[in-house]
Amino acid sequence: MSASYDSIVDQYMAYANASPTRPVEVRTMLRLAGEVQGKSVLDLACGSGYYGREFLRHGARSAHGVDQSQGMIDFARALSKYRGDEMTFQQHDVMEMPFTGEYDVVLAAYLFNYAASLDELRRMFAAVVPHVKRGGRLVVQTLNPDYRLALGNYAAYGVKVLEDEPWQQGARLCLEFPGSPPALITNYRWERAHYEQAVRVAGFSAASWHEPLLEQADVDSRAEGYWEGYVHNCMSVNLVCER
């Protein structure tokens, strides 16, 4: 996995802090994880530690974040120290995690969309499965196979899609995070069948797809029609993998 956020920590955090979809996304992840009280959580591609921190707030026993960007890990540690929470962090590429240990819940928000090939997608799931307890869950948030740039560039939701081009058996997208200067990131979109095959080969027992849980309160908080693009051409989707 080659993407690095070291040079764009400020732009990414500005996007993340202002993103109108963040509350929807964390609500969805929490709901899909099931009962989290007293559970151990591993937050992969953790960034600032937002998701792991939210799971702690909802009763998780522990949360450990892993990210390949040292800049993100430094920021996450400083934020946890400032807030006084007990989330812990390590800087590692998910493909090369040296530590052992199984967790009740493993979170992967916007991780697998960095797989630049189907082989890399399969290897990423294979690298993650040993860290999921038997009976545990991997909760994934990734690029929606059904999203199409022709139907909207997603700029209203905090990140702008500049390109959406065929790539191998999927698509390659160029995303722009706002800032001065803007930051560009490359992501990859794969079909549901590709994910399901990777999940099965890795050794998970079951997988299910879920749409983000947009609630009426979210709709009421914005101007009429604001969420239309999110509902009908959402860039993200969730996948729950059972072990």
Give residue spans per PLM region.
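SAM-dependent methyltransferase
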Residues: 139-200
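Class I SAM-dependent methyltransferase SAM/SAH-binding core
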Residues: 42-44, 48-96
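A short glycine-rich, Lys/Arg-flanked "PGG" loop and its adjoining helix->strand segment in the class I
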Residues: 122-134
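Conserved class I S-adenosyl-L-methionine
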Residues: 1-36, 50, 54
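A short acidic, Gly/Pro-enriched loop at the edge of an enzyme's catalytic core
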Residues: 98-106
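Nucleotide donor/acceptor-binding cores
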Residues: 38-40
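A short SAM/SAH-binding and catalytic strip from SAM-dependent methyltransferases
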Residues: 105-119
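C-terminal lobe and adjacent flexible extensions of AdoMet/dcAdoMet transferase-like proteins
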Residues: 198-243
